[in-house]
């Protein structure tokens, strides 16, 4: 290929990678000399890793693509974290060499000694995410001015927690009012909101983005999957799934795919985005069970049977023909319950090392999305207007009555009238229905409530 | 309750009364008159079989005029010196166990064995509640019988705790003792392995089928109990669910009888799916252990493996059952725990770390039989038969079903053919050309994959079912 720039790596790898970049540029109508501009919004662990993966894969083609990440300015790094960061740097020869070469090392020495305050955006330029200090990333272009970051972006990657998505994208829409071309937006956010007025419904991050910016849903996609950011960046083999319209999901799946990061595509945006939020609810409970039973596999399996049956039941309320909870969605659920910050949070609560009063944003971990999701799902499913037939008592009940684990989590985390130990009581209640009954009920009856996702 | 043997405080008395009520109900159903004991026998002294009988002994053993719980195991299995030393440590670290042995004048033989002055035998220690495969978890004392005829000839309920690889042989012998029985017993099988027969047509043979063939007991009286099976956790009252599968007549009364506060038993009519899945998941548990060891417990890699192996399991289940239970909920929980912990996953880890080798065979001291190994062989051979061909989703030609199960194929080459190393399992899950697991699931649900002959059933039986 004439004119190809190979910084390193095999010719074959270079050709394949550049070809994928060229293909996406063509689809987006980028002419020669016009950079493909990709911006990550929000610098949590996964958002940072995602941007770093793209930088590692495509960053060398500097005349074709530019990858940036926006985060707010002003977040300082405390002394303890600075000391730990210094240890991480000094334990990694490659990182140490890189910082020395870029004349960026001494500020970490000063911070270690307490003589200087570092800021999150500053260290992120060197590849350190405040929520993931132990896993250094490649250097990144960090922008702290939102308008400068997004005004001409072609692809925007939403790495914000869902609780900040609406606010930030409303601001972004002011900068986009006069745009000619419509950007493509990929959302990584897993939380959801519930709205009860005028009718009960769920609001997903992609819906928030569409409402806030006016970008058509066709151009907004959700990327879900097991999301242990540090493992993915360290090239543990991972699968993800990009969900959305036909127009963009296949080309983006191809663009995002790497040898250790397989991206499949799916048209079922709703199920995957909502399930992404729903499984975080049950991940907190899984962490509690693991801690309270000293990692008992037997108790974990009982919990798993019940929580998956509740998830299936809820999914049937939300989607007319939901993807079966088997295969890929199952893998997401499996890893979310096994590891990840929501499960970690549940463990810490059960051990008494954290308490609900500390809120849902934890230093060093980021946002625990499961907490707000518990509130959202429970309030939504408690509405009498959504009543379903009780399988045994021959009366109408709100769907939440058939989800004992969700109810219990609500009372532990939101109402705070129960202790974490009560999650075990939910499992050990002999009167609890066989989880198979809940699944059969979900699959045999027409539970679907289109209004829950704002559909007529 | 008049005549109750309840001992201990009010709480204990209440529990005993509930248990006695359940026992009386089952006795009535089995036509036991006063003075005629309900005889329950566990066959095989493995971890789960022993723990299961111990649960029954703990629950019903006090009603000595109504029920008798026994365990049969073969005599002659010696306890080696290292195990005897470890057993001595376990005994001395548990005050309740130590007191019990002293009280029963059964302690000194363990001192002698510890010193190497005496050889203990597995049946001997099992009488004191020590299962050779589960030495760290002392059970209650058990009545152990080493003569098979004496154990089973008049049994009302038989619990099959044997590995599937021994089920046919032992029940073949039992069949001889039962030739003149008037009333057929009820049999509950815990065995999870399966066999494949390819002559005259390819089909799976399950332990319950082996038992029925060997003894002539009608299938109506044979049930399968499946579920997450970490025997020591269940005996230690970790909360657990299990599922008893079989004909209407017995499964509900037995579910009720077996249920305890920490051991919930649900019932299900789908014997086939649960029994076969019980064997199938052990295959993938070995692979899960390998992946866990090779990736240093990477949750991300585990999830990729989980996604792929569950899609293969779903596919295989659709070949075997006409309307299989969805792999969600309870069956999923079984799969989850089997992949997470348990001896098959443990075995996969040990192989991957090089701490065990295939040459050591599939019966491991202190662990018992690793059923997944023979199951790999059975399923692979069965699904390789060209007479079972299915349409390949992309190449549009007929292929044997195993061609669509890359993990099963890889495990076969690692464990049976032994032509691949354990890290090949990572290559299997990292193959970029591998199908989206969702496609395999959709194919199994869209095509009519069902092959009744695989479970030895002619078409007409399905119509009757």
From Swiss-Prot, chain A:
GO terms for cellular component: cytosol. This is Probable glycerol-3-phosphate dehydrogenase [NAD(+)] 1, cytosolic. InterPro entries: 6-PGluconate_DH-like_C_sf, 6PGD_dom2, G3P_DH_NAD-dep, G3P_DH_NAD-dep_C, G3P_DH_NAD-dep_N, NAD(P)-bd_dom_sf. It comes from Oryza sativa subsp. japonica (Rice). Keywords: Cytoplasm, NAD, Oxidoreductase. GO terms for molecular function: glycerol-3-phosphate dehydrogenase (NAD+) activity; NAD binding. It catalyses: sn-glycerol 3-phosphate + NAD(+) = dihydroxyacetone phosphate + NADH + H(+). It is an enzyme of class 1 (oxidoreductase). Belongs to the NAD-dependent glycerol-3-phosphate dehydrogenase family. It comes from the Eukaryota.
Swiss-Prot record, chain B:
It is an enzyme of class 1 (oxidoreductase). InterPro entries: 6-PGluconate_DH-like_C_sf, 6PGD_dom2, G3P_DH_NAD-dep, G3P_DH_NAD-dep_C, G3P_DH_NAD-dep_N, NAD(P)-bd_dom_sf. One of its GO terms (cellular component) is cytosol. The active site is at 281 (proton acceptor). Its EC number is 1.1.1.8. SUPFAM superfamilies: 6-phosphogluconate dehydrogenase C-terminal domain-like, NAD(P)-binding Rossmann-fold domains. It is found in: Cytoplasm, Cytosol. Its main location: cytoplasm. NAD(+) binds at residues 44-49, 192, 231, 343, 371. It catalyses: sn-glycerol 3-phosphate + NAD(+) = dihydroxyacetone phosphate + NADH + H(+). Belongs to the NAD-dependent glycerol-3-phosphate dehydrogenase family. This is Probable glycerol-3-phosphate dehydrogenase [NAD(+)] 3, cytosolic. It comes from Oryza sativa subsp. japonica. The lineage of its organism: Eukaryota, Viridiplantae, Streptophyta, Embryophyta, Tracheophyta.
